[in-house]
Amino acid sequence: MIYDLGEIEELGIFDGINEIIATTEDETGAPNAAPMGVIKEGDRLSVRLFAGSHTRDNILAAGKFVANVSHDPMLFVETALNDIPEDRFVERDGELTLSDAEAWALFKCEPKDLDIALPEAEFVKGEVLSREFRAVNRGVNLVVEAAVAATRYVALRSDLYLEEIFRIRRIVGRCGGSKEIEAMDRLDELMEQAIDD
């Protein structure tokens, strides 16, 4: 278990915007998972929250979230536009995490800071669950970017986001493997469902 902010890079969180999957619970204990940006600038940590999201509401209520580090493109797609089954969640050291996470980190957000879009976050503890060496896969990173664009398209209905997703799809077709291409196909399905709702 890691408790020192100076060792947070061991959990896969570096300077810049780290796209993670946040796990939270609502007041009834129902789990939620959604992609979210954890921003690290030296020793300063903040999160990007969007009004109207379950994640923001749950963080407001509880004052905390767990950042799950993953390189699974399908997990980002499913959590961006869909509710995942409860069996995908597991409790570790008293905190709600994802069963497929490679690492997790618990953060606190003070309720007084949550009325702004970029509240500061405080690292509490975390754990590395698996250490796999991998080269950078452009396809995985682009699927994550497409999932973010899809959430914005569904919320705002701006064609700019749709054009971005089409551009990304072409590159994923060249740079990604079968998992990334399958994740993009699933993203299309989930976007259609979200738009029809």
Language model: regions and residue ranges:
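Basic, polyanion-binding surface patches
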Residues: 1-104, 108-197
